[in-house]
Curated annotation (Swiss-Prot):
It is an enzyme of class 2 (transferase). This is Octanoyltransferase. GO terms for biological process: protein modification process. PANTHER family: LIPOYLTRANSFERASE 2, MITOCHONDRIAL-RELATED (PTHR10993:SF7), OCTANOYLTRANSFERASE (PTHR10993). It comes from Paracoccus versutus. Catalyzes the transfer of endogenously produced octanoic acid from octanoyl-acyl-carrier-protein onto the lipoyl domains of lipoate-dependent enzymes. Lipoyl-ACP can also act as a substrate although octanoyl-ACP is likely to be the physiological substrate. Residues 1-154 form the BPL/LPL catalytic domain. CDD domains: LipB.
Length: 155
């Protein structure tokens, strides 16, 4: 099903936490890249509460996990798996859509697509990384880290 947001193919289903972020960027600065970077930082901060190091990569939107436990890519670089996808749309500088974080989805559902159009990398989840984290645990971590990345606006 096609939707009007950034990004290419992805999968949404049970076991993912979808977060639709609606913020007025007229009041926070009309900078789409800074907004996406803040979304990524928000997820990275939340993952850090579970001692999981999420990372961003130039040219690839989303949050990535280095996988030294997997075979290297053909070019010798370390394999990385995506744990969170980001797809946003702006209308009159108000954001729509947002992020999806893999908590415990059936990762087999990704087999038929190239997630977000990025070749050579896989997909992971909190549970796949050996963390017994539930939706409620992630929700608390996201709540705690939100204001660090999206500070309240004055008056």
């Amino acid at each position: 099903h096609a939707v009007g947001r950034g990004g290419q193919y992805t999968y949404h289903g049970p076991g993912q936490r979808l977060v639709y972020v609606m913020l007025d960027l007229n009041r926070r600065g009309r900078d789409v890249r800074a907004f996406v970077k803040a979304l990524e930082s928000w997820v990275i901060d939340a993952l850090a509460e579970f001692n999981l190091k999420g990372e961003i990569r130039d040219g690839r939107v989303g949050v990535w996990i280095a996988r030294p436990d997997k075979a290297s890519l053909p070019d010798g670089s370390m394999r990385e798996d995506k744990i969170a996808a980001i797809g946003v749309k702006l209308r009159r500088w108000v954001s729509f859509h947002g992020i999806s974080i893999n908590v415990e989805p059936d990762l087999g559902h990704y087999a038929g697509i190239v997630p977000c159009g990025i070749q050579g990398h896989g997909v992971t989840s909190l549970v796949d990384m050996g963390l017994p984290v539930g939706m409620g645990d992630l929700d608390l971590a996201l709540r705690r880290s939100f204001a660090r990345n999206f500070p309240p606006l004055g008056g």
